[in-house]
Amino acid sequence: MATFATKLGQVQAALDAAGLCFGHGYESAHDEAVALLLAAAKLPAAQSTALLAEPFPVEAEKRLSQMLAVRCNERQPVAYIVGEAYLAGVRFLSDHRALVPRSPIAQLLTEGLFPWWAAASSPRHIVDVCCGGGSLGIVAATCFPEATV
């Protein structure tokens, strides 16, 4: 029986070989492989690296194969396949009806908008306009809890 580590290497190699683009909720073939493995095994995203030594569940093999085929052949984003994406550490449900939460602006928010905003104060009002599903507004609200978003 293959371990999670073995499966991780296999799935990552398949994603790399498929010539896919990354950055739709997951930044690399490795990140996408982890997400697919955990979703196929029906495990939450937060896992210890000790899981890598554990056997990959036999009952998850078919789900993993189907998910990988959809990603590689149909080019669907992993966020749609697994139903979630993370932006600045915030979990968002995700499917084909909305854009995958992703934006380099999220990093600016987590860094307190430095160097564009004075560190001694926080913004009082933040507007998320025409940025997709409102994910940047949600991230802003977590980064600046005293602001009206």
Each language-model region and where it sits:
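N-terminal auxiliary segments of SAM/dcSAM-dependent transferases
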Residues: 2-87
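SAM-dependent Rossmann-like transferase core, predominantly class I methyltransferases
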Residues: 52, 62-149
